[in-house]
């Protein structure tokens, strides 16, 4: 699971941090991944619909392509979320992906897996996910740098997102822990490879 070379991610992060912002400033909830059923992006959209009215400055940004794209766009439209759920399509450029992560507030994985947890943590993001295959356990500590929600439960997911949106200081504290964990992991790697 120790996916993208963490050191090169940190180097990339330094470039991203010094670049001018790409996006309008918002409380951005981010998901990156192929739009396939088992990623449960539909669940994320449902959860966002529940809290969206209370956070006019928030946006759900979905990066990725896949067979579920049309269904998900239709779902967002039906829920009255046009303009609040933004489908970006696939982005393959690591720098641009980094900019999106840097300019987001929370990273959410609603379904199965994604190597993107490491990357999101590099950009000091709190992570919300369900326990899927256990690899998350090494990275995300519930109530420390993210939350686990009850798998398949939109209310539980909405509650976790809302809790962070409502507590910006905590969101920042969680994000700081994420980055620290990644930096420590790098140091461990460096130590163990000597």
Question: Where are these predicted regions, by residue range?
Answer:
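Acidic anion/phosphate-binding donor-loop and adjacent secondary structure
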Residues: 1-26
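Short alpha-helical donor nucleotide-sugar binding micro-motif in glycosyltransferases
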Residues: 90, 97-104, 120-121
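Nucleotide-activated donor-binding/catalytic signature segment of Leloir-type glycosyltransferases, i.e.
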Residues: 70-91
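Acidic donor-binding loop of glycosyltransferase active sites
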Residues: 99-112, 125-126
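Short acidic/histidine- and often glycine-rich active-site loop of Leloir-type glycosyltransferases
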Residues: 118-122, 132-143, 147-148
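A short, well-ordered alpha-helix in the C-terminal region of glycosyltransferases
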Residues: 84, 156, 163, 170-185, ...
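Conserved donor-binding/catalytic core segment of Leloir-type glycosyltransferases
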Residues: 21-39, 43-50, 61
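Conserved acidic donor-binding segment of nucleotide-sugar-dependent glycosyltransferases
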Residues: 142-143, 147-154, 163-169
């Amino acid at each position: 699971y120790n996916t993208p070379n963490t050191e090169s991610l940190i180097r990339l992060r330094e470039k991203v941090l010094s670049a001018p912002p790409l996006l309008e400033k918002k409380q951005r909830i981010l998901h990156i991944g192929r739009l396939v059923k088992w990623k449960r992006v539909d669940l994320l959209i449902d959860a966002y619909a529940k809290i969206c009215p209370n956070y006019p400055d928030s946006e759900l940004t979905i990066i990725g392509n896949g067979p579920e794209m049309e269904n998900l766009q239709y779902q967002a439209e039906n829920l009255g979320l046009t303009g609040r759920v933004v489908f970006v399509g696939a982005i393959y450029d690591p720098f641009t992906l980094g900019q999106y992560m840097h300019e987001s507030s929370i990273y959410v994985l609603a379904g199965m897996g994604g190597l993107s947890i490491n990357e999101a943590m590099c950009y000091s993001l709190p992570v919300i996910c369900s326990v899927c295959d256990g690899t998350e356990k090494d990275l995300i500590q519930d109530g420390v740098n993210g939350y686990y929600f009850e798998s398949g439960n939109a209310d539980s997911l909405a509650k976790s997102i809302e809790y962070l949106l409502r507590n910006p200081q905590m969101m920042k504290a969680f994000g700081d822990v994420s980055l620290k964990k990644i930096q420590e992991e790098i140091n461990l790697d460096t130590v163990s490879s000597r």
